[in-house]
Amino acid sequence: MFREVIRTISPYIPGKPISEVKRELGLEKVIKLASNENPLGPSENVKKAIKESLDDLSLYPDGNCTELKLKLAKKLNVKPTQIIFGAGSDEITQLIASIFINPGDNSIMARPSFPRYETVTKVMGGIPIEIPLKNYTHDLEEFSKHINERTRVIWICNPNNPTGTIVKKDELYNFIKSVPSEIAVVVDQAYKEYIDDPEYPDAIHWLDEFKNLIVLQTFSKIYGLASLRIGYAIASEEIIEKLNRVRPPFNVNHVAQIAAIAALDDQEHIEKAKELNKKSLEFFYKSFEEMKLPYIKSYGNFVMVDVTKDAVEVFKKLLLKGIIVRPGDIFDMPTYIRVTTGLESDNMEFIKALKEVL
């Protein structure tokens, strides 16, 4: 009954929701540090805009996200026709695979990295070529060695999820320049807004030069709109036109569009989230060093720390204390956990609990 490839695909397993943990374990308080969400949530301006939009829930949304597209295009200094929106950037990865990958084609990605790249490749009957990380980041030299006549897409998560590492400007530019123009290069910048490092490359600046480049970004992370599912891609007008051919109608709901428009105007909230994240990472690094736990310096809003024992067991023990993190076994890092930066009090509770379970 089912396509053979479906047997090879594992469903995505999200971080445990707070309500489920409370119900299963009978806990009154649960701190979720598992899914790289903004602990500040959306800004007050966004909440106000959402409340004012509720009378329109009976109407279909703007299928082209016109107002949002115009506003974002101005902010990014690109044409509106270079942008497409999706129900999270997850959906756009599926659209990308559907316009480029035929059965038997391949796409290249790092391992571990964002798991959807592998999934969407398999769904199209493609072959995922997974290149192990080198020093916890993308090994682009090895990527180049695996490009062949059946390669259709190259996925680069920058910063990488789950390790939080980056490919620096010159290395990424030279790699993209070396890739044949008929192969799509996707640079996923979900955590870009957290970064101030001058060596971090914003690939949007290269779109005029590389017509095969696609840049993914999202409102789920620093903007605090994860539950509304809205992300976007910026690329050449030709690529965006092809993506729109396979995009479902009305794929981004009205409330998500309204929230994103309001979020773009609230730079003060973004700066506040960046500052909190910076302080949280510094606190984690200091705490891990005191505990003599190795960790990977992160450019995102999360950090991978080596707990030096079975991460699943540590995850379970933390769960009993009302702390949700991500065990690293799903990333082929069986002694690591990934922890999202939280509010100051949440971070302190996590470190206290971690000391108790180790």
Swiss-Prot record:
Pathway note: Amino-acid biosynthesis; L-histidine biosynthesis; L-histidine from 5-phospho-alpha-D-ribose 1-diphosphate: step 7/9
Xref: Pfam families: Aminotran_1_2 (PF00155)
Cofactor annotation: pyridoxal 5'-phosphate
Alphabetically ordered keywords of this record: Amino-acid biosynthesis, Aminotransferase, Histidine biosynthesis, Pyridoxal phosphate, Transferase
UniProt-listed GO biological process terms: L-histidine biosynthetic process
EC numbers on record: 2.6.1.9
One GO MF term: histidinol-phosphate transaminase activity
Class of the enzyme per the UniProt entry, highest EC level: transferase
N6-(pyridoxal phosphate)lysine found at: K221
Highest taxon above the source species: Bacteria
Reactions that this protein is recorded to catalyse: L-histidinol phosphate + 2-oxoglutarate = 3-(imidazol-4-yl)-2-oxopropyl phosphate + L-glutamate
Family: Belongs to the class-II pyridoxal-phosphate-dependent aminotransferase family. Histidinol-phosphate aminotransferase subfamily.
HAMAP family on file: HisC_aminotrans_2
PANTHER family, per the entry: HISTIDINOL-PHOSPHATE AMINOTRANSFERASE, HISTIDINOL-PHOSPHATE AMINOTRANSFERASE 2
Subunit structure: Homodimer.
NCBIfam families per the UniProt record, alphabetical: hisC
Name the record gives this protein: Histidinol-phosphate aminotransferase
The organism of origin for this protein: Caldicellulosiruptor saccharolyticus (strain ATCC 43494 / DSM 8903 / Tp8T 6331)
Upper taxonomic lineage: Bacteria, Bacillati, Bacillota, Bacillota incertae sedis, Caldicellulosiruptorales
Gene: hisC
